[in-house]
Amino acid sequence: MTLEADKQTHGFQTEVKQLLQLMIHSLYSNKEIFLRELISNAADAADKLRFEALSAPSLLEEDPNLRIRVEFDKQAHTITIDDNGIGMSRDEAIAHLGTIAKSGTADFLKALSGDQRKDANLIGQFGVGFYSAFIVADHVDVYSRRAGLTAAEGVHWSSKGEGNFEVATIDKPQRGTRVVLHLKENEQHFAEGWTLRSTLKKYSDHIGLPIEMLKEHHGKEEEKDTPQEAEWEAVNKASALWTRPKNDIKDEEYQEFYKHISHDMTNPLAWSHNKVEGKLEYTSLLYVPTRAPFDLYHRNAAKGLKLYVQRVFIMDQAEQFLPLYLRFIKGVVDSADLSLNVSREILQSGPVVDSMKTALSKRALDMLEKLAKDAPEDYKTFWKNFGQVLKEGPAEDYSNREKVASLLRFASTYDTSGDPSVALTDYIARMKEGQDKLYYLTGESYAQIKDSPYLEVFRKKGIEVLLLVDRIDEWLMNYLHEFDGKSFVDIARGDLDLGNLDSEADKKAQEEIAKTKEALASRIKATLGEDVAEVRVSHRLTDSPAVLAIGEGDLGLQMRQLLEASGQKVPETKPVFEFNPSHPLIEKLDAEQDMDRFADLSRILFDQAALAAGDSLKDPANYVRRLNKLLLELSA
């Protein structure tokens, strides 16, 4: 590297300044992560070069053996990470090292918790790992040249981690990037061979290309034999983890590899490593994360597996091998049946990709099934983070609908904790004799529906009801019509029929009571008018005076709220007003001769039923007026 030319000073993007302050002043607990991040970046640079060289072999120049080298200088107090990967042009150095994509930065800064260990774990996940260099360094130099550019088009980027950075054009014969860290006075212990080797073994043993350090020679006898020329030796295994036999891989190695590909520093909950031979040949290594990424629900979030073809890296985020509802699964797939020049367009469809997607989806679901069976507490953690995403499955994946349904968890009247811990198989195992339906109720929260009037007859008969309180649940039930041959029934919808759970005598008695109350039903309907579709005697109620039932083909409250929140037009629906003929309030209403008072009481019962269902009132002021009037009459 020779004379510098065209030197310029640039100011960091505002968000980078904030990030640098965090690195310099806040992350004390796990400083060695800087090495993990810089090695990971160097490995990515090698992957990118391999991929580009498939169509442009000249990019490899005279240096086809990709590697990473780590050096240290005790006297100068420096650590150097050198790779011969893709490298950067001057413009790329300014763009990549001076700014961060706005969306990622904003989310990163919002996600910071103040907990040093948690915040340190977020660094790689948000693609800002380079700046971790400033945890241990007060000055960082980067020398780089992009593959394909001339030696005279190298770039030197330099910063002290303050408000700005310098770039200059330099001569750099070697392709790739060399990062030099000038260590802070109190961090100079990192410039030790043993420290660096042990840290590299800990975090980067799984990296699929050699990480080399100079051989160190100790003692006077060895010094005599010390070779004149520097000897480099690999300090990692340097083989793609997924290509090794499962029996040779320790759990710790699987865990570290997960952290490398996911940039998530928590251990995964489970993994599945499989080699498929026969008509199709591929190897897959799939992981279930412990926690959800910050952008799990972002439409354009990164998702998909790392794709390799015959061990050559092709692309990150190959979305085509798993359905969208399994987007949280991390891992790699290495195929022998795809061509090396495969593109995203080619991957959109085709028999090979479709077959792999089917098999990998089943593999991922099997992994979740095993987790639920063998480690229920871990599955609870999974469900808390990814349950709502998995609920997209029945709509998206018809062939695996039953399998996905078996993995779903709900709250129910069986467990008063309100935790979503009940599997559909558990529910079926507890069904009453003669019960052939799966009963459920949707609502905004467990607290809102646990004492709902809709549950009264079920509590009386000891029938368990699933309580569905996620915003997605009513939408889910539009696609999940049955499980294990048994139909789902929304207990707030239509004219409730308990089938064999009601005796013939009970049914006959209900019909006779309904006939005796036809006149009252007509009076209430005349009062409520167009606000209701129908008024009838209820078979649901034992304690409450009235309830609003949803029409068979109408949208429920959850779906209406979901559509309203997204700005869509919601079709108008009219509920069915059901009343409990044996309730004292209904008996008083039936005996009321004053039509104004009858109208006020009917309206109060209607509004209260709407509130009990979790709905809001169209005219709350009039409800309060009527209620106050009634209270005054009662207190007179």
Curated annotation (Swiss-Prot):
It is found in: Cytoplasm. The keyword Chaperone applies. Residues 1-344 are annotated as: A. Its main location: cytoplasm. One of its GO terms (molecular function) is unfolded protein binding. Residues 562-636 are annotated as: C. The keyword Hydrolase does not apply. InterPro entries: HATPase_C_sf (IPR036890), Heat_shock_protein_90_CS (IPR019805), HSP90_C (IPR037196), Hsp90_fam (IPR001404), Hsp90_N (IPR020575), Ribosomal_Su5_D2-typ_SF (IPR020568). One of its GO terms (cellular component) is cytoplasm. Residues 345-561 are annotated as: B. Belongs to the heat shock protein 90 family. This is Chaperone protein HtpG. It comes from Xylella fastidiosa (strain Temecula1 / ATCC 700964). The lineage of its organism: Bacteria, Pseudomonadati, Pseudomonadota, Gammaproteobacteria, Lysobacterales.
